[in-house]
Amino acid sequence: MKNLIAELLVKLAQKEEEAKELTVQVEALEIVVTALLRHMEHDAQQALIQDIEQAIDQVTPCPPVNDHDAMLLQQYLKKLLRHPRS
């Protein structure tokens, strides 16, 4: 029983480490996207944002994603593109 608990704790620690790594990757990408948007002229920036939003609207995920997850993705993209971090 102790071995099982120890194995579960090791797996949990690995999952936590993976989650931290993904968080760091997402934050790094946010910084890069924000910097790129800030260095673009306004018209080019707006055109890029519209292209991204249209592409997202046209995507049909496979396998299908539930509506809540799709809405979260759209909200996050809107926040990132329309209101980039300071």
Curated annotation (Swiss-Prot):
This is Anti-adapter protein IraP. Signal peptide: none annotated. Its main location: cytoplasm. Keywords: Coiled coil, Cytoplasm, Stress response. It is found in: Cytoplasm. Inhibits RpoS proteolysis by regulating RssB activity, thereby increasing the stability of the sigma stress factor RpoS especially during phosphate starvation, but also in stationary phase and during nitrogen starvation. Its effect on RpoS stability is due to its interaction with RssB, which probably blocks the interaction of RssB with RpoS, and the consequent delivery of the RssB-RpoS complex to the ClpXP protein degradation pathway. GO terms for biological process: cellular response to starvation. It comes from the Bacteria. It comes from Klebsiella pneumoniae subsp. pneumoniae (strain ATCC 700721 / MGH 78578). Belongs to the IraP family. Interacts with RssB. InterPro entries: SigmaS_Anti-adapt_IraP.
